[in-house]
Amino acid sequence: MASFESLIKDVLPYVPGCPDSLIRNNLRSATIELCEKSKAYTYDLDPITTISGTYEYEFDQPSGTDVHQILWATYDGHDLDPISPRSLELNYPDWRDKSGTPTVFLQKTPDTFWLVPVPNSKKVNGLLLNVALKPSRTTSSIDTNFSNDYRDGIVYGAIYRLLRIPGKEWTNPPASADYFNLFQNQINDAELRGRGGDTGVKRTVKYKSAGLSPRKRYGRYGKELDY
């Protein structure tokens, strides 16, 4: 696991005087936003055994993460379809009282989901799920591979958030807007990679501008990226 603490040094030169704790919190928030919008942090959960008469199940995701979305699910080798709460009640009004072979799923919380119809038999390791994860609001770290692959996006996201804070010595709304655009570009790239549309992204940035003023640091950062 890679700690958010380890990324502070990449952000601090662009927000001089900013407390480490504030940078760390914004690194976490930026990572959560990147994960939610790109769905790039994917994970195959361990197979789940269903129980007859039980429709609610818990995710067994890695510690320090929440399940943002179920990307696909299979039951006994057959695909399940996602369903919204409204569609569930409209199309299966008495589903709690009926059992059968599940055909749809509904994610209720970051920790739980439902199967409908209610399973009518036990299926050992019969349920497979692929999910999009995101860091929890209290975690201090993120998967090392994800951090390495999307380091630029995480850093840009933290910088744009910090630069827009009003009344600080590092406040810089114009630079914040540009870093926001860089962050959005990284989200788009992450989404493409998450869908398998890219086999790799070359890192082009070196965070080496500690001796420059905030505006020059910002300008140099953009120049190195050729934006």
Task: State where each predicted segment sits.
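Glycine-enriched, solvent-exposed interface loops adjoining structured elements
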Residues: 1-227
